[in-house]
């Protein structure tokens, strides 16, 4: 076996515990590997310190243990531990064989430590397909190969910059804001499918002239929680969105280390859109929120800003495994029957049939009910209940919940020596109508969720006849999108473009202009996340990029939108020219565009707001001047046309 030496560089920490006042700590790391121990410098008042501390360990074996412990330095008293973690050299060598030379180590309390490493001589790279995963994060505590999470090679996208934030602040807010942008979620909540990529964006709105950032850390996590305790991590991946500026290649700092976070990046005033991508393994579970059993997935973001307070954002996303949907539903028919003999004699039987036993929320269950009555009873109706039963852990007796009850009457009534076959339609509630209607679950030693229909034949003056029909609830097609009513959306479009919401802009494209290709053929469209106030400030070339999916209709859409924008801007410029900028808001509240402005008389202008007589008169005189100039131009154009016609007729006569 080849003997190899190892160098470790403790680069940085992230999301560490803040033990001092202000939620920060004076952070340093103690390292131990056999007889070798080392300590980094203390970085004060931080939860994301940068150390860049190099340690030459020397020769190591695959089973050599590396120990890291993070401390909060105290001037007086004992230093306080902030968490620890450990990893075997085999964990690092497996990454080196895949050309991965740095890893995040998860502390056993909160936060992470990032290290890089170098083996001498280096390991030969393993041959693997492009889909082969790379080592991303090492687990905490008793680290072993089984606690490692493997994620596909990170893909970084170039950020999009839109200079859309006006010089004046919005709602007197000068702080930088951020939020997640989920594609396809304008009209409804969009779920993500296991085995596919999560393609989203992080939107950073900068209101100051510029901000300076050290890092834009993004994480994607998912876990199973049972009775308040995490049972299993389903996904755990990380990105620094600043790597999008370099295509994912770390930038060497002054010390020669590949560490982008030590290089500050300036972000100008405007909207910065950072597209990102994570992968959900096909073995992950669907999102569930029960009292004792939860499967949750979160996107979390933290921006380390130099000249402003740091900002954070978190959003839960819905994940669906196709095994829990209509794509994997079983086509097992329902066929059950039972009978009884009343004391008064005769027999009553009931049978229920359906072509399948799997249904999704909102679907109609078509149940064929057949009743044969040879007794003296007169049967009028049948009662149907939908029950959900939750089994906790290994319990055999579950807790039952009634989700739906209904009564169906027989027409005509089933009298003695008669039979009736009737199709009963049971309308399952949607998930919005009944939050408790989740898909059927069977998680070993944790929870089991089952459903059944109780069909109760109501027999007068006798014990009712009951059938229990087990059914399976699955989730609907996760990729099916229900669009709203086009007429309603068009009717809700504000008169002013500047008042459009993001939803209004989508509705204008989809329904009013009837051009779905803008979104269908341009996957980047959703990343712009544009409202009316944004559209008012975009240059023409950006509008062409937004509408490029429209193909030959791109020019039409740009012209239509710009004409509406110009109608507003002309009114603003008109008032600014008269030094009446303070009246812009009053005019826009009355939705006065340029074409309407030129038709206003003095009384209408004066009634807009508490405008002074002098200002109203100045506006009215300016309107008259513009109308007069327009009339002169029109007369000149008419005279020019007449002159041209006379010249043509004169040439013909000659």
Swiss-Prot record:
Any GO MF annotation of the entry: phosphatidylserine binding
Keyword Coiled coil: yes
GO annotations of cellular component type: cytoplasm; cytosol; plasma membrane
Keywords assigned by UniProt, alphabetized: Coiled coil
Annotated coiled-coil segments of the chain: 616-647
PROSITE patterns, alphabetized: C2 (PS50004)
One Pfam short name: Arrestin_C
Coiled coil among keywords: yes
Family as reported in the entry's similarity comment: Belongs to the arrestin family.
The name this protein goes by in its record: Arrestin domain-containing protein C
Natural source organism: Dictyostelium discoideum (Social amoeba)
């Amino acid at each position: 076996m080849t003997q190899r030496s190892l160098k470790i560089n403790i680069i940085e920490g992230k999301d560490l515990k803040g033990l001092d006042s202000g939620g920060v700590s004076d952070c340093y790391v103690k390292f131990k590997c056999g007889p070798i121990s080392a300590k980094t410098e203390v970085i004060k008042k931080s939860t994301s310190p940068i150390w860049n501390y190099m340690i030459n360990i020397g020769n190591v074996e695959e089973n050599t243990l590396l120990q890291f412990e993070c401390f909060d330095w105290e001037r007086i008293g004992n230093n306080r531990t902030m968490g620890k973690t450990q990893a075997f050299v085999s964990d690092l060598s497996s990454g080196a064989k895949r050309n991965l030379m740095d890893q995040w180590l998860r502390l056993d309390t909160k936060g992470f430590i990032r290290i890089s490493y170098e083996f001498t001589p280096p390991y030969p790279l393993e041959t693997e397909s492009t889909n082969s995963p790379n080592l991303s994060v090492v687990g905490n505590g008793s680290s072993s190969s089984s606690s490692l999470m493997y994620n596909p090679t990170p893909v970084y996208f170039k950020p999009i910059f839109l200079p859309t934030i006006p010089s004046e602040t919005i709602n007197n807010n000068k702080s930088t804001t951020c939020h997640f942008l989920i594609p396809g979620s304008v009209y409804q909540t969009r779920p993500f499918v296991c085995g596919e990529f999560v393609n989203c964006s992080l939107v950073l709105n900068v209101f100051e002239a510029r901000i300076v950032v050290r890092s834009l850390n993004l994480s994607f996590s998912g876990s199973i929680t049972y009775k308040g305790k995490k049972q299993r991590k389903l996904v755990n991946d990380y990105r620094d969105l600043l790597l999008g500026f370099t295509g994912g290649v770390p930038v060497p700092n002054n010390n020669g280390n590949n560490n982008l976070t030590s290089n500050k990046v300036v972000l100008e005033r405007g909207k910065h859109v950072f597209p990102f991508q994570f992968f959900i393994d096909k073995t992950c579970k669907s999102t569930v929120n029960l009292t004792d059993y939860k499967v949750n997935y979160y996107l979390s973001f933290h921006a380390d800003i130099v000249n402003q307070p740091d900002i954070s954002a978190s959003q839960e996303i819905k994940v669906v495994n196709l095994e829990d949907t209509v794509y994997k539903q079983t086509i097992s028919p329902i066929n059950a029957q039972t009978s009884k003999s009343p004391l008064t004699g005769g027999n009553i039987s009931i049978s229920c049939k359906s072509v399948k036993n799997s249904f999704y929320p909102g679907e109609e269950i078509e149940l064929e009910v057949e009743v044969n009555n040879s007794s003296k009873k007169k049967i009028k109706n049948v009662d149907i209940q939908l029950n959900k039963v939750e089994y906790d852990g290994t319990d055999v007796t579950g807790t039952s919940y009634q989700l739906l009850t209904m009564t169906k009457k027989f027409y005509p009534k089933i009298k003695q020596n008669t039979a009736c076959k009737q199709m009963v339609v049971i309308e399952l509630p949607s998930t919005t109508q009944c939050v408790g209607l989740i898909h059927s679950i069977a998680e070993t030693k944790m929870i089991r969720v089952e459903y059944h229909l109780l069909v109760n034949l109501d027999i007068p003056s006798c014990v009712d006849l009951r059938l229990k029909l087990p059914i399976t609830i699955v989730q609907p097609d996760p990729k099916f999108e229900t669009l709203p009513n086009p007429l309603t959306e068009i009717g809700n479009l504000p008169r002013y473009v500047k008042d459009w919401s993001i939803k209004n802009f989508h509705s204008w494209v989809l329904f009013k202009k009837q051009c779905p290709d803008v979104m269908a053929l341009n996957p980047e469209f959703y990343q712009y996340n544009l409202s009316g106030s944004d559209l008012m400030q975009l240059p023409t070339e950006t509008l062409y990029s937004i509408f490029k999916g429209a193909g030959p209709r791109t020019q039409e859409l740009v012209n239509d939108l710009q004409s509406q924008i110009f109608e507003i801007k002309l009114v603003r410029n008109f008032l600014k020219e008269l030094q009446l900028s303070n009246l812009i808001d009053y005019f826009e509240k009355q939705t006065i565009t340029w074409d309407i402005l030129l038709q206003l008389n003095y009384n209408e202008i004066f009634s807009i707001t508490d405008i002074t007589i002098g200002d109203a008169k100045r506006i009215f005189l300016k309107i008259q001047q513009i109308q007069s100039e327009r009339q002169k131009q029109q007369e000149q154009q008419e005279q020019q046309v007449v002159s041209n016609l006379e010249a043509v007729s004169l040439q013909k006569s000659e």
